[in-house]
């Protein structure tokens, strides 16, 4: 058995490719079932966010395991291997362990140290738990990674400055508009990222916010909290005309705002400029919208420059965090190596117990037949000793014949002779 991590993220692929390998939440169970039908896969977790899609797996080691897993990924998403091969990364053993710990701790995020990723990792883990898709090794690894993330959060200043994709979107809005108090903001979606954006905007005196969502019920609690109006996606077309800023993050698999819709909006607005920030993957806003006059469209990838500006405070803390990850990954690998001996130890103990039971039964039978107790005990200990030392003696003799001094020393250590 070996642990693997196979993935694609914001560092290796643009959003145009990442959105094609997203696993939608409502079909994640189906994907896990399909993944576990692969003969080499013992357990799996699928992590799919706007910035990464990753498979964490425990597998039976095979020569072509990489090719098998990439083939499954491509077939599932109807992609050709040559479309993704150069963007995929592959980690095995300790590298896979360290990678997950870094991801859970926010050390591999677009925004260094951002806390949202830990919740996303926990959600992916819970989905695999519900689907009984975890091996014992994989379950232990994820639990350990949650502990590591907590250590990083409490023992370093990695989360001291509040930066995230949501924060970056709001920073962009503040850079473009002198005052957010006088603008109308339309938020599309009601998920975690939009919640963060809405709270940030409220704290920066945005007076007019509208939340558009597929259902009013999901958005109403957030709207009440931040003082926003709620509309459905069906009302989006007529509401866009009033929006100076649009920030969108839904789980839709197709664009919600298209070029035609925006052409009508701009005409009604008499070409007043609009800032549009699309932080969804797959994208909510058709890329062609960005080519329209007076529309300033930014995607997740465009936020990268803004985010880089906020990294300086976290880099020193990241060095300390990496040290924690290195220590914890080494400890986990030591535990994992020890597990390979568990079955051998179990078999050895079972063999010894079987021998003890056999010898005891013979001794008791001899005593019941009237044989001298002391003589029976002497015979018992003699036979038990011979049986116990038989296999080690043969191994010692073979090591001596082979001239294998290392094996001889290992056997001496195992037998407690030194």
Curated annotation (Swiss-Prot):
Q: Which InterPro entries match?
A: 4pyrrol_synth_GluRdtase (IPR000343), 4pyrrol_synth_GluRdtase_dimer (IPR015896), 4pyrrol_synth_GluRdtase_N (IPR015895), GluRdtase_CS (IPR018214), GluRdtase_dimer_dom_sf (IPR036453), GluRdtase_N_sf (IPR036343), NAD(P)-bd_dom_sf (IPR036291), Shikm_DH/Glu-tRNA_Rdtase (IPR006151)
Q: Which residues bind NADP(+)?
A: 189-194
What keywords appear on the UniProt entry?
Answer: NADP, Oxidoreductase, Porphyrin biosynthesis
One Pfam family named in its UniProt record:
Shikimate_DH
Which residue positions hold the site described Important for activity? 99
Could you cite one Gene Ontology molecular function of this protein? glutamyl-tRNA reductase activity
Q: Which residues form the active site?
A: 50
Q: What class of enzyme is it?
A: oxidoreductase
Q: Where are the transmembrane segments?
A: none
Give binding positions for substrate: 49-52, 109, 114-116, 120
Q: Which reaction does it catalyse?
A: (S)-4-amino-5-oxopentanoate + tRNA(Glu) + NADP(+) = L-glutamyl-tRNA(Glu) + NADPH + H(+)
Alphabetical GO biological process terms: protoporphyrinogen IX biosynthetic process from glutamate
Q: What is its EC number?
A: 1.2.1.70
**What does this protein's UniProt record list under function?**
Catalyzes the NADPH-dependent reduction of glutamyl-tRNA(Glu) to glutamate 1-semialdehyde (GSA).
Q: How does it assemble?
A: Homodimer.
| Free-text comment about domains | Possesses an unusual extended V-shaped dimeric structure with each monomer consisting of three distinct domains arranged along a curved 'spinal' alpha-helix. The N-terminal catalytic domain specifically recognizes the glutamate moiety of the substrate. The second domain is the NADPH-binding domain, and the third C-terminal domain is responsible for dimerization.
This chain's protein is named: Glutamyl-tRNA reductase
